[in-house]
UniProtKB/Swiss-Prot annotation:
Adapter protein required for efficient degradation of Spx by ClpXP under non-stress conditions. Interaction with Spx stabilizes Spx and exposes the C-terminus of Spx for recognition and proteolysis by ClpXP. The keyword Cytoplasm applies. This is ClpXP adapter protein SpxH. The keyword S-adenosyl-L-methionine does not apply. It comes from Bacillus thuringiensis subsp. konkukian (strain 97-27). InterPro entries: Adapter_SpxH, Thioredoxin-like_sf. Transmembrane segments: none annotated.
Length: 297
């Protein structure tokens, strides 16, 4: 691949079954570590099969205060429950240091912040969420406040002034309430949960709760698309790093299906070229892209 080709990922022209025929919804709580650790699965699925599906994060965080009205747990219509599995989730304890009970009003504020960021676009919301999770789980921020949320907005390269206006806006509140309602309609009882729907069909959706092997997600996607689908080649390593900006050796190794040793050899070459900075955090090695950001698609 030449230098110019390595800068961008060009999706091929869609065929009859490549029109984003599947809609995926990932139900998360931003303060739950399992919801952070599923992200490499989603990134890999998107890189290989992103032309077949769209994905949206649904925030399931707790509402603020004891007077907030609760939704009834309705039996979801038109959804097939496939698997449910207990993961390493214990309450909302993250890394043994970040606990929900330590931050009674945090879930509402954090959820509103994610919705405020999403008002600038789905991609902006995803960038903000990833940056927020880095603060929470890598720097042990147990009680994200407005100052930290503004820092996340700045680090995510979204419009900070717009974010400030939207943080307590009716639009962000309505978006969060819609997420809560959808969570209840889908009868989400475990996070993370992933729900797939065929965009152009009245057929039932598929829900998978917990975290499974990557092949399971591919299998479900193929079942819904209902035609032969092949994975796209993964992008060059530099393209992934430009897009994510900050990623661990473990995540990169998973995405490329290589050993950490192999991946770190390549990453150290980029370090010598002064394209990445190596950062050791909590017995895990992370890599920060130094050059200007470029998107995957």
């Amino acid at each position: 691949m030449d230098k110019q080709e390595a800068k961008h990922i060009n999706m091929p022209s869609p065929s009859a079954c490549e029109h984003k025929s599947v809609e995926a919804y990932l139900f998360i709580d931003p303060l739950c570590k399992d919801c952070w650790e599923i992200e490499p699965f989603i990134i890999k699925l998107w890189l290989e099969y992103g032309k077949y599906f769209s994905i949206r994060h649904i925030v399931t965080g707790k509402v603020d205060g004891t007077n907030a009205s609760s939704h009834k747990w309705n039996k979801p219509a038109n959804i097939r429950f496939v698997w449910e599995k207990t993961t390493s989730l214990h309450g909302f304890s993250c890394d043994g240091k970040v606990h929900m009970q330590e931050a009674s009003s945090t879930p509402y504020l954090v959820s509103m912040a994610i919705k405020a960021a999403e008002l600038q676009g789905r991609k902006a919301g995803s960038k903000f969420l990833r940056k927020l999770q880095e603060y929470i789980f890598l720097e042990n921020v147990s009680n994200p406040d407005c100052e930290l949320l503004l820092a996340c907005a700045k680090d995510s390269d979204i419009d900070v002034e717009e974010f400030k206006k939207d943080l307590y806006s009716a639009s962000a509140k309505k978006a969060f309430q819609c997420d809560l309602k959808f969570t209840n309609e889908m009868h989400i009882t475990e996070i993370p949960s992933l729900v797939f729907f065929h965009a152009n069909s009245d057929e039932e959706g598929i829900k998978i709760a917990g975290t499974y092997s990557y092949d399971v997600y591919v299998q479900l996607l193929k079942e819904l698309v209902k035609c032969e689908i092949e994975p796209e080649p993964l992008p060059p390593l530099e393209v992934l790093l430009e897009a994510t900006q900050f990623i661990s050796s473990k995540e990169v190794a998973f995405i490329y299906d290589c050993s950490k040793q192999e991946i770190e050899r390549e990453l150290k070459k980029l370090q010598l070229k002064r394209k990445v900075q190596m950062i050791d955090v909590k017995c895990e090695r992370y890599w920060k892209w130094i050059a200007k950001e470029k998107d995957l698609v």
